[in-house]
Regions:
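Short, glycine/charged-rich "phosphate-handling" switch motifs in NTP-dependent
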Residues: 11, 23-24
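Catalytic metal- and UDP-sugar-binding loop of GT-A-like glycosyltransferases, i.e.
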Residues: 15
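A short, surface-exposed alpha-helical micro-motif characterized by mixed small hydrophobic
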Residues: 5-7
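NTP-binding/hydrolysis catalytic cores, primarily Walker-type P-loop NTPases
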Residues: 132-138
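Aromatic-residue-lined binding/catalytic grooves and analogous aromatic/hydrophobic interfacial grooves
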Residues: 1
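Short catalytic/signature loops enriched in Gly
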Residues: 25-132
Length: 138
C-alpha cells in the first residue's frame, strides 16, 4: 500500500517480478519516479477527490518460475523500447539518493516525457507535500 509507505517510510524500494527496479527517498519515488512500473503503480492509487475509474495495469505479471529476458515489465509497458525485451537494464543513477532500472535513463534512449497523467500526479502530490510542510504524505 503506497499510501502507508508514504506516511511511515523515509526510503522506498519498488519491486517488480522479485527485483528492485527503483529505489529512492519517499520524495524521489512519489514526486520524481522514473520507471514505467512505478508510474503505473502511482497511477493506480485511489484519489479521494475524483470519481474516475482506477488505472489498471494491462496484462499479467510474469511467472517467477520461468526465465525472464530483458526488462520483466516490458510486456506490460505501454511504451516499451526494443532493448527492453532483450537486455536487463542496469541501475541508472538519477541522484545521490535515487536510481532506477530502466533503459529510459540511458543516454542513448530517445528523450521521452513522463506520461501526462504522471506529470499531473507528481504535481498534485508535490502540492500536498508542500502544504504538509515537507512532512511525509501521511
Amino acid at each position: 500500500d503506497l499510501g502507508v509507505v508514504a506516511s511511515i517510510a523515509d526510503k522506498v524500494a519498488v519491486m517488480y517480478s522479485g527485483e528492485i527496479i527503483e529505489y529512492g527517498t519517499v520524495e524521489d519515488i512519489f514526486y520524481d519516479s522514473r520507471h514505467p512500473y512505478t508510474w503505473a503503480l502511482l497511477s493506480s492509487l485511489p484519489q479521494l477527490a475524483t470519481t474516475e475509474k482506477l488505472y489498471s495495469i494491462a496484462g499479467t505479471p510474469p511467472s517467477l518460475y520461468s526465465e525472464i529476458k530483458g526488462d520483466a515489465f516490458a510486456p506490460r509497458n505501454p511504451s516499451p523500447m526494443a532493448v527492453d525485451f532483450v537486455e536487463i537494464p542496469p541501475k541508472f543513477p538519477v541522484s545521490d539518493t535515487h536510481w532506477a532500472k530502466t533503459w529510459l535513463l540511458d543516454n542513448r534512449a530517445p528523450k521521452m516525457s513522463k506520461p501526462e497523467g504522471i506529470q499531473d500526479l507528481h504535481a498534485k502530490m508535490l502540492k500536498i507535500y508542500d502544504q504538509a510542510g515537507g512532512a511525509n504524505l501521511g
